[in-house]
Amino acid sequence: QKSDRESVLLREGSIDLETGVIGSFTSPEVRTRRLFGDRFVGVVRSGHALAQGEISAERYAAGQHVLVARRDQDTGPMDDALAALGLQRTITSIVGGFTAALALAAGSDLIATVPERHTGNLRAGMFSFALPLGMPDLTVSLMWHPRMDADPAHRWLRGCVVDACAARINVG
């Protein structure tokens, strides 16, 4: 989840738009628009041991994991869900984004936990599985700095992103 500190790139104008999962608090410096609902899935490389057989919470927790987290975080919501079952996973790598997590999982025995729809194309050729424990659904949002609200080109771009996400969801 993106924290208040993550609005720096938008505020500085280094980026115009960002998509991602946001927490319950967002900076007043960031405008958001819901793009779609999503759910977390586990992802491993083809041929990984988890690609065979039933995936229990115990098997999932026993693997080596890559965590997507922002600064100063070394656990995520998955760790809370596992702890409720008396389980703990081993996080061997922490990265700042889902693309990096999937790249690591594709070339190793690491397990990535990522949003299903948000990473659909990035997971091609990998083995994806439903998580063996209850995780709340999440919302993927579009974010931008308020100074861009009235910019016609930026409004057009935001509209294109919203339309593309809606079309992709309606197709499957």
Model-derived segments and spans:
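Short beta-strand->loop
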Residues: 31-41, 111-119, 124-139
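Secondary-structure junction motif
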Residues: 21, 28, 50-52, 57, ...
